[in-house]
Amino acid sequence: MFSGSNSYLGGNTGRQPPQQPQQQYGGFQPNQGFQPQQTGFQPQQTGFQPQPTGYGNAAPLQPNFTGYPLQPQPTGYSQPSQAGFPGGQQQQQQFNNAPQQQNFQTGAPPIPQIPQQFQQPQQTQQAQPPPAPPVQQPQATGFAAMADSFKPAAAEPSKPRGRRASKGGAKIPSIRLSFITAQDQAKFETLFKSAVGDGQTLSGEKSRDLLLRSKLDGNSLSQIWTLADTTRSGQLHFPEFALAMYLCNLKLVGKQLPSVLPDVIKNEVSSMVDIINFAIDDDAPAATNAPSFDGRQNTATPPTIQQPQPMASNSALLTAQMTGYPGQQNNFSGGFQPQQTGFQGQMQTGFSGQQGGLQPQPTGYNQMSNPQATGYNGPRPPMPPMPSNFSSHLSPAQTGMQGGMIAPLNSQPTGVDGQWGLVNAPAPNIDLLHSRMMPQQGREQGNFTTAGITGNAEIPWGITKDEKTRYDSVFKAWDGFGKGYISGDVAIEVFGQSGLPKPDLERVWTLADHGNKGKLNMDEFAVAMHLIYRKLNGYPLPAQLPPALIPPSTRNFNDSIGAVKSLLHQESNFRKNSGATLLPQKTGVSYLKNHSFRGDATPGRTGRKDATVYKNNDDDVGYKSSARRRLGASSPRPSSPGSTTSNDDLSLDQLRKKIAERQVILDAIDFKAENAADEDDALDRKDRREAEDLYHRIRRIQEDIDAHPDASLRNVDSGAERRALKRQLQTLTDKLPDIASRVRRTERSIADAKLELFRLKDAKAHPGSASSIVGTGPGGAITESDRLKARAKAMMQQRSAALTGKKIEASNDDLDAPKRLEEENLKIRTEKENNERMVQDVEESVRDFSRGLEDSLKDGGESSSSEHEKRRWEDGLGVEDEVKDFIFDLQRSSRSARVRTDDRSRETPRTEASHASPAPAARSETPSSQPSSTPTPAGGSYSQYKTPEDRAAYIKQQAEKRMAERLAALGIKAPSKSGETTQQRLEREKNERAAKLRQAEEEDAKREAERQARIAEEQGAPPPAPEQPKETAKKPPPPPSRKAARSDASERKAEEERIINEQKAQIIATNELEDDAQRQEAELAKEREAAQARVKALEDQMKAGKLKKEEEKKKRKALQAETKQQEARLAAQRAEIEAAQARERELQRQLEAIDDSDSSDDDEGPEQVTPQASTPTQGSQELERKEPSPPPPPPSIPVVVSPVPAIATTTSLPSPTPQVTSPVVSPPVDTETRNPFLKKMAQSGDASTASTASNNPFHRLPAQELSTPAPIQVQPTGNRPSRVRPEEDDWDVVGSDKEDDSSDDEGPGAGGARHLASILFGTMAPPRPLSSMGNEATSAPESPAVASPPAATPPPPPVPNFNAPPPPPMPSAGAPGGPPPPPPPPPGMGAPPPPPMPPMGGAPAPPAGVRPAGLLGEIQMGRSLKKTQTKDKSSAAVAGRVLD
């Protein structure tokens, strides 16, 4: 709101003519010191023509009352004039209700009296702040009536013109404000329209009345007004009014008002205010007494002037000025300064960059200080400048002083065609369009509409800088690969999001794709987006692209191409016309006038050669080729330092001399070449030797790696293993908070239970004390309400006692009970806090440990260089063919060794279990099994620690130990312990190194034994004899320790039981962690196997196309054929010695029968004195398949039979527990077997199921079975009758594991699917008699031995010499009374029954339904049974059968 108003000019002619206010744009400082100027001798017939009051970019101006408030009068003439530059916006002041002023005879309009506030002497040079004017009406600022301004005034206003017709009332754009909701905005619009009426702004008084309804205090309303009035005009546009309502709501809900508006809200409000001001239509001017200039009027069609855009939103209003007095302006930046009118030489308004104030100019004669009469008949006032032409550019006209200093001006784009990216008009809905056109999900459906992005804003042809920035961001978002263009298919998707119909999008593409390239660059994409933007705001698409939208790149590119074409055309014509087409290479003369295509004929540049002339200058180079000059001897050879004359001038002697010299040189060259060749050969031989040596060393290292105990770990993908370990570590770490919370809950429960127990005990000890009060407070505390209840209860008891006559003993302990309870509560709380600190310490230590593990896993990650080296030296990528073949050969040998290791590892668990099965006494003497069975002496047991701190430290120590062991097994170094001293760490590392050294020595010994056995097998001879003492010396230590262990067996047993009982708490605490770790290890093993399978498949694929593979296949086939032939020869040899071994077998059976009868009543478990290393044979019935293990602690009497000439046997008796074992018989000392059944079974083993596989082509040879007594292996690696020895081991080990400590029978460890099946199906049916086997005979059948044994057994009948099926498996320990079902016998084989097993003295009585022992005795005596013809071989080897 303006603080002052201008007065109307009065009716006396002695006063100054009116002064039109003129805006001085861009400044806030008032121009002081303007003196009233004289009007000169101008005839004032029709008044003064109004002059331009602003610049082309001026914001819309508001009307100002410049006279008395009660009778508004026009200050000049409402016909605006042309400012003289394109895009200039004229200001117009009109009042439809202004009455016509009378024309006096003087020709000048009557001047009203000067208001009181302006009656000052004219000599006053100081500016006065004008008072506040009355309510002002909005001023139209369009260009519709610009051309009509030069015509005679009409009697009534013309109708509005422009793109949209004028409507009554406030014009509010359809733009959503983001800081209020749509419903609130609709309500505010209704309220604003009802309050503003036909105007566009809400005055300060009305705004005050509306804001006072909010009941807010004056300070808040003042702050709200300051924030809302963004234009500082004293009036509110609709967005400002909505902002004021929004701020009032913030204050009403209790929020603080912001000191400064946020940029988003401020920009939205300012932009909408500018749009409202620019959208105001121009109305027709009111009738005035302006003179008619018909004679000088330009009748041509006025040009179409581009709508200018505002530079700032706060320069929208005029500053009211006194028209007749200088200095009547305020400090508002958008105000106009008073300017004298009527002088021809006015200032030019179409340029920028000048500074300084406007100097008032006289309108008549210069320096006239006295007012002049208005009736002077001189020249008329100058007509306002008209446009000089109506082309695309308008000529500026002079409107002020030539060369005068003006206020700083900002250069504004005029909107003329060809201007690119310089328009600064507000861009409504551009944010919505930008967000719509960006890549978004769901765009594949294509269901886009124009809802939400359409509008009716006025948009110029030119693209604004803000729009160009947004279009470029959309382009870059879709051009993900940075190609610099967008193809047609992408453009369909982008432009389709606008919702425009397909024909419009086709026209947009046609207009934007300059040159029909099928793709759009960044500028062309901006053009297309701008066309879409205009179309969404109601503008039609043009038929052709206007010059304003032609991208500079396209325009400049076409111009540059045209310039180059023109240059080439001109140069070609010049050469053709001037004869310059002659070859300058021959003439050496350039026929061009200039040495440059640019036509720069500078005399100083004539010596410089360029592309116009080319002539090679041989002097500029250091080498000259004379070969081309020697052809035909047309020119002499150029001189050289070594030859001054030609060969023709030399004499014969000279020529001979030169030939001899050349011959000497050639001989020297040949000699040097021979020496070099010899040296190269020597170097090649040396390199070959070194390479062979390296190959050999690499092979040895690879063999050592394959034979290492941790060789299986290196085949695992380290990355996958590391990720699996990280996942396992994360899983365990995630469980820590839950475990800690459960511990804390348990501690709280314990504390509550202890407190409750104390209350009960205290109440029992002091029946009448106050401790009987039950506390209901937190933690069982007694509250005041509990005491009141107790007192009321006591009073009731006293009253009831008084009524009944009973006596109530008064308690004196009322004060002591709370004290005792408080002491106990404090004690319990202290203990609870101590436990909580311990739990926190454990949590922190576990977290530190997990962080250390995670860091170690991260540090061991593979880099790109290591990955490259791995692919090069393991996959053979990027190396020579010879090296690649060597790598593949190493991999093949490594896989073979790994398969052999896997075969041995399958038997290792059972062997270790056989060592771990004896009593604790024997276990304590075994170094290998001692760590797993007895606790570490340094660690102690869980029960040894009495305090919670010690127990927590013990649990932590054990957990760290187990984790370190697992990490060591995986090949990861465990992080150092924070609480471990240097001495302890050195001691621990020393022990670890010693253990690893012992293990490595044992593994080396095993590998050496296997290698010797393998060599012996390949040579077809039995193993060397010196190995037997070695193995014997290796195995026997357990038996000698038997007596020493038996001496303190009871003590160790008691200690073991006590330790087991004490470790229950620790087992409970760590059981869950170990189960999870085992599960993770199982998953890791599966992943490792999968990775190995993938690697193996990849290797097989790489080798598939190799020629060497075919050669290897041929060699393998030949080797297999040779193996089969050798097996055939060995089978024939075995058949020849079968007869010689029959007698040996009979003597062996008799000896076993005698041994069994002698030891039938002994309770001692099976014992084997002779080590397994001396019993390598496996085919006979009498051989025991298990490793020697420490004897049990109970006293046992082993029956050692004196050796016969060919056999030394040791029979072990079964224990009284229901365990079925078989006797053990040692073979001859010389380890050479002559058992024909062993060889028969080796031949028939092809039809049986092999427990392990082997890659050895000689696996069927008996020599291998004879010479592979691995120290920890139970079975040889070759094929053999697989249903004899594993099942015997299974029976023994299960029995020894499952029975009590009193039954300490030996037996190797067993496991696997067959063992489990024998346990499951061994007891499902009653025992089957041996008659189901038919009349077959087997070389080594295992008798079930479940019937009551006789005192002695007769010698077995002779056994026919033919191949027989393998024996049935031994029953498991879980089924003591039932024998396993026999395997299906082959058809057509009738033979006496097999010899029986020695009787088991301690076997229990058979269960009900079992056949009597007499039948078994008859069968053992040789009774013939019915022949069977069963041919079904599909059942499993250990499948059960249902008997009738």
From Swiss-Prot:
GO biological process: endocytosis; endosomal transport
Subcellular location: Cell membrane; Endosome membrane; Cytoplasm, Cytoskeleton, Actin patch
Stretches with biased composition (Acidic residues): 1153-1166, 1287-1307
Region annotated Disordered, chain positions: 1-140, 289-309, 594-651, 797-1444
GO cellular component, as recorded: actin cortical patch; endosome membrane; plasma membrane
Biased composition (Basic and acidic residues): 607-622, 806-875, 899-913, 947-965, 985-1017, 1045-1061, 1076-1113, 1135-1149
Mode of membrane association: Peripheral membrane protein
Domain annotation EH: ranges: 184-272, 467-556
Domain EF-hand, chain residue ranges per copy: 216-251, 500-535
Primary residence: membrane
Compositional bias annotation for Low complexity: 14-56, 78-105, 114-127, 297-309, 632-646, 914-937, 1198-1230, 1339-1350
Pfam families, per database record: DUF1720, EH
Subunit organization: Component of the PAN1 actin cytoskeleton-regulatory complex.
Protein name: Actin cytoskeleton-regulatory complex protein pan1
Record lineage: Eukaryota, Fungi, Dikarya, Ascomycota, Pezizomycotina
